[in-house]
Amino acid sequence: MLKTNTVFYFDSSDFINISHHYIDQANFSLAEKAIKMGLDQHPNNIDLMLLNSELLIFNSSYKDAYKILNFVEEIDPENREVYLQKATIYSKNNLSEEAIDILKRALTFIDDKLEIWNMIAMEFLLLEDFESAIPFFKKCLDFDNEDYQSLYNLIFCYENLGMIDESISELSSVLEKRPYSKIAWHQIGKIYNKQGKIKKAISAFDFAIISDDQFVSAYIEKAKVLEKIGRITEALENFRLSIELSEPNSY
């Protein structure tokens, strides 16, 4: 149909599914065509309008996308996607404060807040406002203690603020809930190393390796510490293991 320009009537959900299919395949020209045909048949369908604005944002046509989003907002003032897309437009135009404002507005009526917390935190990170980012990354971690990207970002914020004790406390809290968290052991090991607490650092990297014996970064960090204190043979062995595990056919 899309390749021959033959037009058939489809339900709006069919056009939405077809559009998502082509977007997932990164075939945006056919996705645009499907959305246009869908809107020709279902001009008032909000989901198709939002797919259209999403593609316009992808193509950097921000003004056109914003017009659509304003129109949808008039029809559906509490549409979650409208707020997320508007925030994306602001962010892409280096207007992080405006993005944060609109995301905070969305928090007042949206039940599923996780994505919004993360988006707000990332905008604060772009502004290098680490102190403001911290509570939102903490909310993400409280919701999902396996959200390691938020954990990395939270520790990054603490380190930039010189809040080392808070970093250790946060990682220790994660380890209380998940004692085999290789990421938490790895991160706390790096902190101990920076503090010159060599024995604690090595122990932490050992626990990271116990948690996952394929965890290359733990072997590398442990090797660096061992090299620093002159335990060269052990350092070389850990470097060797990290190289071996990094090879394509390693198991």
Predicted segments — roles?
Residues Q41, E74-D76, T108-I110, F143, ...:
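Structural marker of alpha-solenoid helical repeat scaffolds
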